[in-house]
Amino acid sequence: MAAPVMSAFGRLQGLIRTERSLLTHVQSRCIQTTSVCLKNRAARVRVGKGDKPVTYEAAHPPHYIAHRKGWLSQHTGNLDGEGGAAERTIEDVFIRRFIFGTFHGCLANEIVIKRRANLLIICAIFIRKMPTQKFYFLIGYTETLLSFLYKCPVKLEVQTVEEKVIYKYL
């Protein structure tokens, strides 16, 4: 009877010694030398062999905003003393994803979202890939659903083109 108790006591002492040695080992090593995984990316299309078609928006890097290209979201939330910029950004992301999913494969360029007082205007250029009746139905569906969701009038300003407009090749 004494032998099993002693062996259990011996195992417990061994575990305590191991734990103490691990604690001193962990406390002495406090620097990690791993490679950094957060890499910066350029927000532009890289110049290649000249076989990559790009649109006007993608051809110019972001520092040309307000010089050669415009803002894709126009509202007064970023002015001094105005609130709600974060909420508008989340709304813009939802609207862009909703329209991309509704008109799948038909977007020719980026969507421009304008807010004027209580009116939400969405400007888009689409490629003619579907029948006109279906296209008009999806426009009405989008306007109605977003109007009920945001509780304000939503208007889609739409232009259609035969194929994607290519600005230049990079």
UniProtKB/Swiss-Prot annotation:
PANTHER family reported in the protein's UniProt record: MITOCHONDRIAL 28S RIBOSOMAL PROTEIN S24, SMALL RIBOSOMAL SUBUNIT PROTEIN US3M
Subcellular location, principal: mitochondrion
GO biological process: mitochondrial translation
Taxonomic superkingdom: Eukaryota
Family annotation (InterPro entries): Ribosomal_uS3m
Similarity annotation: Belongs to the universal ribosomal protein uS3 family.
Subcellular location: Mitochondrion
One GO cellular component term: mitochondrial small ribosomal subunit
Gene this chain is encoded by: mrps24-b
Subunit structure: Component of the mitochondrial ribosome small subunit (28S) which comprises a 12S rRNA and about 30 distinct proteins.
Transit peptide: first to last position: 1-30
GO molecular function, one term: structural constituent of ribosome
Pfam family, one: MRP-S24
Protein name, as recorded: Small ribosomal subunit protein uS3mB
